[in-house]
Amino acid sequence: MVVLCKNALPLLVAAIALASCVEDPYSHTQPQLVVEGWIDDGDFPTVFVTTSLPFTTSDTTDVDLVQHVLKWATVTVSDEEKSVVLTGRVMKHQTPPYGFTTTRIMGRSGHTYKLTVDCPPYHAEAVTTIPPKAVVDSFTVTPCLENDTLYQVMAHVSQQLDLPQGGGYKFFGISKCRDVNYKSCYMGLYKPENISPHPALPVYNLHRPDNRHFSPFFSYSDTLKIKFTTLDGPSYAFWDSFEDDVSLSGSPFFSTNSNLRGNVSGGLGYWCGYGSSVYYLLPPKKP
């Protein structure tokens, strides 16, 4: 037995050496420009600029992610009146933790905003229009009958808006005990035909990539800040593909390996104008 082990050792060493010489098949993937940006009615633009992280067989560290942030990009937002270069700054609690913004241009419903990003060799452009502002008439907040630790939210909307072609409505939210930034509400996207007189639209829990025990309802520890927005056609298409990806990512029967339907020419990502209204909700009294 000892002799067999000694004879096998050189083969094992050779196998390890051979494996170390095998080239990572994804190591030469060319990075692409990635733009994530939005401008709300009555608020200032926010833009993040990175390069795509290639598929790889090796582990990815936080250092690797930071190296994909393009801090020296020139980011410009233009409307019908002026063109403004945004200022780069550290943004704590964001991913990535560095972005671009300005107080010299503010979103207004009915106005169109062009985004330009230059960081040689990359150049990207995108255009978005902020639709009329969405308004919720009232919210109904009720305990869940099946679980006394959870509650559910319904939004009552009667407003009929003339939205851009292909546009729609979306809910975002913040749980004040857990979040700093808005997150997408699960299945929170609605077409105009869903907004009939006095409908009750369910507002589901927030999508968190690290949440392995998801419930569509909210915990009694959640004090909510809900943003109800209108979207133009390209913005709706992006969030529609995002929700498809989230919904199907856990299914073994459907593939979700396609890119999201962004509206950035010259790169990946989105530039969205939001006609937004913000509401604060408290948990109901426990039954």
Predicted regions and their residues:
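Sec-dependent bacterial lipoprotein signal peptides
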Residues: 1-19
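A sequence/structural signal for flexible, mid-protein segments enriched
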Residues: 21-287
